Amino acid sequence: MKTKKFLAALSTLLIFLSPALASAETVVTSFYPIYLFALNLTQGIDGITIRNLAAPNTGCLHDYQLSTGDMKVLNKADVFLINGAGMESYLTRVMDTFPKLPVVDASTGITLLTEDGMDEYVDDHDHDHEDEDADDHGHHHAGEANAHIWLDAQNAIQMVDNLADGLISAMPQYEAQIEQNRADYVARLTALDAELKETLAAVPNKNIVTFHEAFPYFARAYGLTVAAVVNHEPGDALSPAQLAELVRTIRALNNPPLFTEPQYDDMAAQTISRETGAPIYTLDPVVTGPETDVPLTYYEDRMRENMQTLLVALTPAKGE
């Protein structure tokens, strides 16, 4: 008798739970910045699971190749959130394999820069998405769009808005919660942007030398100048002639600080620093981070750390 009562109660419970289980949504993000934004937009929503496609230590997706495991994750996705602007070079393959999978492009409406950060990017190609699987997969070409849009907090706000709209379109049953999360997050990002502008407006020196093309959007937004970029793509080896030219450029600029990134080695920076005396600092492009127990303020925390690093690096010590 007890067994029958237990089974009856269990059946009733499953009947009530089954709609919730059936409506569980899987949101897949392409890499870490989009993952951080998605976590904030879906916090507190029990019916949504966030899966990040690239491992949290991957960094930028310059040469990222989809694995069999990635394709299995995408096969279970209800929506795929991407950075866009050319970051996901594999996108055509995803769309061909999963033609019904909604893809939300966070870069929509953002004015893009070229890879060198000097000009606005003009898309003269007749396509809507990344040209995927090219032979020179992920490598730098002058005039290509710079995809590191999230390092301008105003751009981050636009990205969050685009992602929120896409999530609501894909899962309208969560609209109220997503809208509340959007409002809360945009308020925090707006405060971050104002703080960055106010703080960095005061630094007397504006030139920085970076080791990757991650920071042109940051520099444009906050009044800095990327005077030189050492490696257009992380891991590119410099020839002796290229190294000598960089040393000459940096000396001509009165040895501005060199900014490395924690995701990549600083061997070239150390060499240039020895030759010029230029100091070395670290800026984080927020492309890696913890996989579990991720603080919702992780993006803001790293951006404020970058702000403090720049404040120290670009403000002469008293007496200088």
What are these regions (language model features)?
Residues 1-5:
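Positively charged n-region of N-terminal signal peptides that target proteins for export
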Residues 6-9, 101:
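Extracytoplasmic entry segments of secretory-pathway proteins
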Residues 8-19:
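Bacterial N-terminal signal peptides
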Residues 24-320:
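Extracytoplasmic metal-acquisition and chelation regions
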